[in-house]
Structures are given as structure tokens and as C-alpha cells.
């Protein structure tokens, strides 16, 4: 039997960002591929002391794992929501019983949060243990892209166990295609708009115009060329988006993607790229991002070094050039809405 680990969310505070959307879509796609849920239920361990929480999560995971038999396959979304210091040992135990264990990576925290000065040392140690020990023993790992694969190889994970996803899928109930797109429409920015992640929004050049969707935006600091539309639930957001391109950019500078979040784009596939493409919009990405390779290969967007170059780059596109980008974005978007990329990656797991 093929299973996926179904970890229950304890809180719903992230309902209006894409954090839950990516995991929920993975679960829906693998269900369609015949995977069964393996339920991991936990009490609110946030209210427990560290040791008690670790023991509680380990006991719950062991109980879930006890249902698996030789020949079964288990897919785990990474990082785990209810990871404990005992997880690696428990995974090894079921592997010795003949269970194959695979991971699909959403984030590598060692490349992101663990580099922040504000992250406690115990959290950095946990990240190191989880990412170094747990992924190393996997029977297969789905990474975002070839660049992330190379980082994992440097961490000691055998290359033959690694599969590249290429881009995240994004399911849209009741999808409606958008018509009449033009290169002169505003640039779309969706997602977490808070200062620490999207500080560049307060430093944009006067043109082009930008349409903003998400949480954390300081409207009192909005620029003249910015229009803020508020936040939406992930499944409602695609219908609300209006513009000519979707922007994938992070950090505190419009000159380049900078800081912890900006540098992270060198390695990861931002989920908002999938949102834009699934919604039918071509992308604007940072030229040094991992995603730029996919975008340029598929012809579904443009890549720039700086947002100060964006207006000129768009102006230099002919209407026919832009329509080609739109057509390619819609073609890739159809694949993304169908779950094509995860389905393909699952077939390549050893």
C-alpha cells in the first residue's frame, strides 16, 4: 500500500497565506494517485514542556507507524509539522521492517530561518538534526529543482535518491481563464507582504504600477504606484488577481533579492510562482533565482537583475512576444492545476 503521513494542523492562523495550501494540494494530488492517509494525531504540544512534547510526538508517530507493513510506501511532507528528536530512529525502525520512506521538501530551513539571528540555538540544532539525519536515511527525496538537489548532495544525500519537482502544483477549484491580458497592466504581488519578507515594496521605482494581495502590508507607507486589494483565502485568490505579470521577489531591496528571504530564492521554488502560473499570468523572476532556469526554459516569463530594469524590459517586449509568454504560462498553468509535476516526480522515486 502507498500512504502519505497526514499530520493534523493544530491552529488555523495561517488560513490567509499559502502555507497550508501547498501541503493540502500535495495531499489531494497523492490521494488521486492512490495513496491512503496515515493519520498522525497529536494533542496541543505547544502547551507542553520541551521534553514532554518530544515524548508525546514520538509516541504518536510510533503509533501511526505501527500500522505499516513490509512492502508499504510512505510519503512524508518535509519539514514535518510534528517532528521530534526521535523521528529518525522511528523511520529507521519501519525501514528495517521493509517500509520505503520518501520525503517531499517544502522548505529547507537551514537555508532560510536558521540563518536569522533571532532564531534560538535549540531551533537551529533541531533544524540541523532534522535536515541532516532524517533526509540522509530517506529512500527517496523530491527536491524543488536541480540547484536544491546539488545542495542536498553536498549535505551527503546520494544523488540517485533525489528527484527534481521542477515547480509546485497549485490546484484551483472552479478555475476561470482570464482574457485580455496586456503587458501594460500592473505587476501582481501576492503573499506575505510584511516588511521582513517584502521590504522592497516600500522602495519600488515609480513605474510600472503594482497590485498587491496578501497580509502584512503597511498601507500607511504605500507608494503612489501601489494598489492594495487586501487578503484572500488561497482558493479564492486566483479569481481576484488582476495584472499583466506575477512577481516573485523577496527581501528589502528593489535593486536585487537580498537578505535571508531574498537569498533563499537562489535555492527554492516560491509557491507564489505556481499561484501566478496556475492563474494564467506570466512571471517576473530574479535572474539569479533557481526559478529563472525553469521560467526561461518554458518561456513563461522574464528574468531581471533589478526591479529598476523591469519597466524597460517590459517596454522592449512586442505585443507578440508578450502573447507568447501568456500562451506558455497558460500551458504550464494547466499542468500545474492538474498536479502534473508531483505526479511525474512520484513516478521517478526509486
Predicted features along the sequence, with ranges:
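Conserved catalytic-core segment of nucleotide-activated headgroup transferases in glycan assembly
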Residues: 23, 170-242
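A charged, aromatic-enriched C-terminal amphipathic alpha-helix characteristic of glycosyltransferases
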Residues: 179-180, 305-312, 318-350
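Active-site proximal beta-strand in glycosyltransferases
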Residues: 73-75, 94-114
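N-terminal subdomain of nucleotide-sugar transferases
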Residues: 1-43, 202-208
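Membrane-proximal helix-turn-helix segments that form the acceptor-binding/catalytic region
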Residues: 90-100, 120-141
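A short, active-site helix/loop in glycosyltransferases that binds the activated sugar's phosphate group
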Residues: 113, 136-162
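Short N-terminal targeting/anchoring amphipathic segment
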Residues: 53, 64-86, 99-102
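Nucleotide-sugar-dependent
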Residues: 238-279, 285-293
Amino acid at each position: 500500500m502507498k500512504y502519505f503521513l497526514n499530520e493534523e494542523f493544530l491552529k488555523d492562523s495561517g488560513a490567509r497565506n499559502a502555507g497550508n495550501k501547498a501541503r493540502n494540494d500535495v495531499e489531494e494530488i497523492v490521494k488521486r494517485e492512490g495513496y491512503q492517509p496515515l493519520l498522525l494525531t497529536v494533542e496541543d504540544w505547544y502547551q507542553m514542556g520541551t521534553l514532554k512534547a518530544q515524548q508525546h510526538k514520538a509516541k504518536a508517530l510510533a503509533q501511526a507507524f505501527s500500522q505499516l507493513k513490509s512492502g508499504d510506501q510512505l510519503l512524508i511532507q518535509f519539514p514535518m509539522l510534528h517532528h521530534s528528536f526521535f523521528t529518525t530512529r522511528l523511520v529507521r525502525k519501519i525501514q528495517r521492517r521493509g517500509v520505503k520512506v520518501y520525503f517531499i521538501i517544502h522548505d529547507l530551513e537551514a537555508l532560510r530561518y536558521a540563518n536569522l539571528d533571532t532564531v534560538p540555538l535549540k531551533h537551529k540544532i533541531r533544524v540541523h538534526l532534522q535536515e541532516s539525519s532524517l533526509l540522509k536515511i530517506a529512500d527517496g527525496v523530491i527536491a524543488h529543482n536541480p540547484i536544491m538537489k546539488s545542495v542536498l548532495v553536498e549535505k551527503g544525500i546520494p544523488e540517485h535518491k533525489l528527484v527534481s519537482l521542477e515547480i509546485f502544483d497549485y490546484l484551483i477549484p472552479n478555475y476561470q481563464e482570464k482574457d485580455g491580458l496586456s503587458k501594460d497592466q500592473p505587476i501582481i504581488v501576492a503573499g506575505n507582504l510584511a516588511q521582513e519578507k517584502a521590504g522592497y515594496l516600500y522602495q519600488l521605482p515609480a513605474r510600472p504600477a503594482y497590485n498587491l494581495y496578501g497580509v502584512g502590508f503597511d498601507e500607511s507607507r504605500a507608494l503612489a504606484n501601489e494598489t492594495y486589494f487586501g487578503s484572500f483565502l488561497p482558493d479564492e485568490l486566483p479569481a481576484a488577481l488582476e495584472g499583466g505579470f506575477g512577481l516573485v521577489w523577496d527581501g528589502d531591496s528593489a535593486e536585487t533579492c537580498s537578505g535571508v528571504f531574498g537569498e533563499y530564492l537562489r535555492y527554492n521554488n516560491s509557491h507564489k510562482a505556481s499561484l501566478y502560473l496556475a492563474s494564467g499570468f506570466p512571471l517576473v523572476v530574479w535572474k539569479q533565482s533557481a526559478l529563472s532556469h525553469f521560467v526561461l526554459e518554458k518561456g513563461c516569463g522574464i528574468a531581471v537583475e533589478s526591479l529598476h530594469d523591469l519597466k524597460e524590459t517590459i517596454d522592449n517586449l512586442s505585443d507578440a512576444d508578450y502573447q507568447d509568454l501568456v500562451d506558455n504560462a497558460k500551458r504550464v498553468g494547466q499542468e500545474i492545476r492538474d498536479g502534473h509535476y508531483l505526479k511525474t516526480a512520484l513516478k521517478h522515486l526509486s
